[in-house]
Amino acid sequence: MANIKSQIKRNKTNEKARLRNQAVRSAVRTEIRKFNAAIEAGDKDAAQAQLRTASRALDKAVTKGVFHINNAANKKSNMATAFNKLG
């Protein structure tokens, strides 16, 4: 347990940020999971809609500082490749 006042404050701030980041990360993972389910089902229209929402969620997460921009770009690229393979 921290004794220094500034570190006690930082611990509170870090915990709030951790919970916020966890929620955003979970939401992004859910969108990617929905996209993968649409790909597995072979539903091109649903996959296209999910690709759009998942990409949007990733971009928002980058803006909030949860994901690095290159990490999000790689995830979007992998999803686009999977979508294009769907035919």
From Swiss-Prot:
Is rRNA-binding among the key words of this record?
yes
| Pfam families, alphabetized | Ribosomal_S20p (PF01649)
Q: Does the keyword Coiled coil apply?
A: no
Q: What are the GO cellular component annotations?
A: cytosol; small ribosomal subunit
InterPro entries in UniProt: Ribosomal_bS20, Ribosomal_bS20_sf
Report the superkingdom from the record. Answer: Bacteria
PANTHER family noted in UniProt: 30S RIBOSOMAL PROTEIN S20, SMALL RIBOSOMAL SUBUNIT PROTEIN BS20C
What is the documented function of this protein? Binds directly to 16S ribosomal RNA.
- Any idea what this protein is called? Small ribosomal subunit protein bS20
Q: Which organism is this protein's natural source?
A: Corynebacterium glutamicum (strain ATCC 13032 / DSM 20300 / JCM 1318 / BCRC 11384 / CCUG 27702 / LMG 3730 / NBRC 12168 / NCIMB 10025 / NRRL B-2784 / 534)
Task: List the taxonomic lineage.
Answer: Bacteria, Bacillati, Actinomycetota, Actinomycetes, Mycobacteriales
- Gene symbol here is rpsT
